[in-house]
Curated annotation (Swiss-Prot):
Highest taxon of source: Eukaryota
Record membrane topology: Multi-pass membrane protein
Regions that span the bilayer: 15-45, 60-87
Annotated SUPFAM superfamilies: Cupredoxins, Cytochrome c oxidase subunit II-like, transmembrane region
Organism: Praomys tullbergi
Purpose: Component of the cytochrome c oxidase, the last enzyme in the mitochondrial electron transport chain which drives oxidative phosphorylation. The respiratory chain contains 3 multisubunit complexes succinate dehydrogenase (complex II, CII), ubiquinol-cytochrome c oxidoreductase (cytochrome b-c1 complex, complex III, CIII) and cytochrome c oxidase (complex IV, CIV), that cooperate to transfer electrons derived from NADH and succinate to molecular oxygen, creating an electrochemical gradient over the inner membrane that drives transmembrane transport and the ATP synthase.
UniProt name for this protein: Cytochrome c oxidase subunit 2
Gene for this chain: MT-CO2
Lineage, top ranks: Eukaryota, Metazoa, Chordata, Craniata, Vertebrata
Statement: the UniProt record of this protein carries the keyword Transit peptide: no
Compartments, record wording: Mitochondrion inner membrane
Reactions that this protein is recorded to catalyse: 4 Fe(II)-[cytochrome c] + O2 + 8 H(+)(in) = 4 Fe(III)-[cytochrome c] + 2 H2O + 4 H(+)(out)
Amino acid sequence: MAYPFQLGLQDATSPIMEELMNFHDHTLMIVFLISSLVLYIISLMLTTKLTHTSTMDAQEVETIWTILPAAILILIALPSLRILYMMDEINNPVLTVKTMGHQWYWSYEYTDYEDLCFDSYMIPTNDLKPGELRLLEVDNRVVLPMELPIRMLISSEDVLHSWAVPSLGLKTDAIPGRLNQATVTSNRPGLFYGQCSEICGSNHSFMPIVLEMVPLKYFENWSASMI
């Protein structure tokens, strides 16, 4: 999860987030090299006294500055398209969870189980226990099995919301009347925090999301106790 004065991204917990972090580093390196080159050229233009006043055209240079940016854009676009495809693809999910956004809480329904559904509200600051996080803890966590593909169906009952868990690389809009899909996969157990990431009203800041990723055996015990 995030911590005060953090500069980088949160630690990746899913294969998708690992790919996104690699793509971020790849793109940042390209942007840094281009920026350095542009600043170097500008500094030369400001400091040198040599000018080419008689130059009418330079086809070779024009060809280079047309082809080179196109090649750079392709180097950025290809990994991006690959990750977009990976984010939309889901093969044989072991579990489907329907997520509904409300003003201002989330409700969850495990569609593979009968009568396994609950609402998830933020715990008020006055009710927090020692060690719990302000504005991030909920009364009912979403318990899911780790290392398995899980399909999340996301929608809204009222206004636009956005279901986001940064460490898993997830951010999916919850739109009234529309059903969006996301894939959840975690490489390790633990608690993973997120929040509504779309302005949805006065209590928008009080819609936390908590995923508890556990081994399959513990998930089966939890689901049996909830039914």
